Design a protein with these regions (language model features):
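Phosphate-group recognition and catalysis centered on beta-loop-alpha active-site segments
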Residues: 3-243
């Protein structure tokens, strides 16, 4: 009898273990599931070629994320990917890096500088200056789609309402995206009509300045639970991630 009970106990534990694995699997799928209800609205964007940070060309003195780069992209009928930051005095500017060193050969950060101070800097040794986001929108004027990356160092969410205050009157096609899921969550809550995307890659191997848990959750798309992105943009080299 005791042997029979032991066997029954073993079989029961095995069943519980299998149920646990299945439940965890479906729970994970639920957590990483994007919003699929607007897939038809995403499709037109997938059919376009994109000028990453505008159609820049150092040999022609056209820096990345500059007005000439955006003019060239529009001229070639290319969709535009660009990046936005918030300055210390609340201006939304188009720039990729947090640091000013690589492009402007200057110390400091965009977030730590006023817009007037940034206008004294030049982009990649040219005569071009960091453009205002509103000026870029005014120029593009809906002629090509925009893919706008929210740059949110230190998870300062002030950029989100500032960007939305500019975007809410823009009539052209655009989507927003970010590595920071809190920024995507802000749009999910406050401007749900905006198409939004989660950027990700093998973040646990990079960006040590950010908390490991946050990088882990974004890498494995666990933060989709709080922001329900309409699309996921994953670094191609890291596409082996099981999520």
């Amino acid at each position: 009898d005791s042997e029979m009970w032991r066997e029954m106990g073993f079989e029961w534990r095995e069943r519980v273990r299998k149920v646990y694995v299945v439940v965890c699997f479906f729970l994970y799928l639920y957590m990483i599931m994007p919003n699929t209800s607007r897939r038809s609205k995403i499709l037109p964007y997938l059919k376009r070629d994109y000028a990453h940070r505008g159609l820049h060309d150092s040999s022609r003195l056209i820096p990345e994320n500059s007005m000439p780069a955006f003019r060239e992209a529009v001229k070639q009928n290319l969709a535009i990917e660009l990046d936005i930051h918030l300055t210390r005095d609340g201006k939304v500017v188009v720039f990729h890096d947090e640091s000013l060193k690589r492009i402007c050969n200057a110390e400091g950060t965009v977030e730590g500088s006023t817009f007037d101070a940034l206008q004294h800097l030049h982009l990649s040794g040219t005569s071009e200056h960091m453009p205002l986001f509103s000026d870029v929108l005014r120029y593009v004027n809906g002629r090509v789609p925009l893919l706008i990356e929210l740059k949110l160092p230190d998870s300062n969410m002030k950029l989100c309402p500032a960007a939305w205050d500019i975007l809410k009157d823009y009539k052209g096609p655009y989507m927003v995206q970010s590595f920071n899921s809190l920024g995507i969550r802000w749009f999910h809550k406050h401007a749900p009509q905006v198409l939004r995307g989660q950027l990700s890659s093998a973040l646990t191997r990079t960006n040590p300045e950010n908390p490991f848990l946050a990088r882990f959750c974004v890498q494995f798309l666990l933060t989709n639970l709080i922001c329900r992105p309409d699309f996921i943009s994953y670094k191609l080299a890291d596409a082996g991630n099981p999520s």
